[in-house]
């Protein structure tokens, strides 16, 4: 079940404030955030947001196709290093 339409989308206040001030000044720089649950809104298009993956901040350049999705969807949190290889020795 999705979020109620009357509530609107969730965007962290501090993130939205930073985006709006940068838009008013026509300034582009990387914004660090830990808010993976924030929804991408049209004001964010063209900005680079560094989203935390649990270890480091990874840059995400926001495009039109990303609007409506969450920031955390574009930053993987787990690293798959492959399955264990076959044991070369036979069991005796």
From Swiss-Prot:
Keywords: Ribonucleoprotein, Ribosomal protein, RNA-binding, rRNA-binding. One of its GO terms (biological process) is translation. This is Small ribosomal subunit protein uS19. Belongs to the universal ribosomal protein uS19 family. InterPro entries: Ribosomal_uS19, Ribosomal_uS19_bac-type, Ribosomal_uS19_CS, Ribosomal_uS19_SF. Transmembrane segments: none annotated. It comes from the Bacteria. The gene is rpsS. GO terms for cellular component: cytoplasm; small ribosomal subunit. Gene3D superfamilies: 30s Ribosomal Protein S19, Chain A. GO terms for molecular function: rRNA binding; structural constituent of ribosome. Protein S19 forms a complex with S13 that binds strongly to the 16S ribosomal RNA. SUPFAM superfamilies: Ribosomal protein S19 (SSF54570). PROSITE patterns: RIBOSOMAL_S19. The keyword Signal does not apply.
């Amino acid at each position: 079940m999705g979020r109620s339409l009357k509530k609107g989308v969730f965007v962290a206040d501090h993130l939205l404030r930073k985006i709006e001030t940068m838009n008013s000044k026509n300034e582009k720089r990387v914004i660090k955030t830990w808010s993976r649950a924030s929804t991408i809104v049209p004001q964010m298009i063209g900005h680079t947001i560094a989203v935390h993956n649990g270890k480091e901040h990874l840059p995400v350049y926001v495009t039109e196709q990303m609007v409506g999705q969450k920031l955390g969807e574009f930053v993987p949190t787990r690293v798959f290093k492959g399955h264990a290889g076959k044991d070369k020795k036979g069991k005796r």
